[in-house]
């Protein structure tokens, strides 16, 4: 009842604009806009038996244009339950770009069991989705994105591999890190090694692509291992550790790698090392191989 009273008061005050969706001579659903300054929140619903025919998409498109042209807002947004796949399609087809997921505690949304809402929005300055630039930007907002990690396989002339003990986990790993948005993975490997170890090493050819399944709170990722070349063991004396991330760094035998690294990391190092020594093309493995 409190919700109904609030909606009634908002309608009377003009802060909640409700519209009926008509099709084929009957009312098939509704939609509403809630202007708040330069932003308006958009919502829609369809009655059973009238879904899947494009009615909600057309209504949403019309209300977005109405908000921009008649209400003076500069941003229209919609919050959609991530379990509601059809409403997510409506948001996308009406030209709203996916911006992210707003996390919620149970009881904070209209459905008490919702733990998040997907935020979609369109700005008045966004190119129309009828234009190539606008359509590409729309697709780019919701298509899957996969994290990329670049690492460098650095060896000495005895076949040992440079590994690091990190501050944020117990096991050792190859030097490297997450590729920044828009950054070349090959350049990222060299950048990370310079930042973490103060070594200026060029990343050579790709040795291994390793898909990492979700693990320990991380989403899945792709790890790219590049050839860092073979060097004199004395290069380790030039290392200046980035204390925030690196505890130790040293050359290790394969036996030491197996003892110090997680099993999948050890498998990845062995796969990359085998490929570097054989001179074969880059290999693909999953969880180290």
Regions found by a protein language model. Name each.
Residues 20-22, 43-56, 80-81, 178-181:
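A short, internal acetyl-CoA/4′-phosphopantetheine-binding micro-motif in the GNAT/acyltransferase core
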Residues 46, 52-69, 85-93, 185-190:
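Conserved acetyl-CoA-binding loop-helix of GNAT-fold acetyltransferases
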Residues 79, 95-117:
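Conserved catalytic-core motifs of GNAT/GCN5-like acyltransferases
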Residues 81, 156-195:
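Conserved Nudix-box catalytic region and its N-terminal flanking loop in Nudix hydrolases
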Residues 119-153:
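Acidic, metal-coordinating catalytic segment for phosphate/diphosphate chemistry
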Residues 170-171, 242-289:
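Nudix hydrolase/Nudix homology domain
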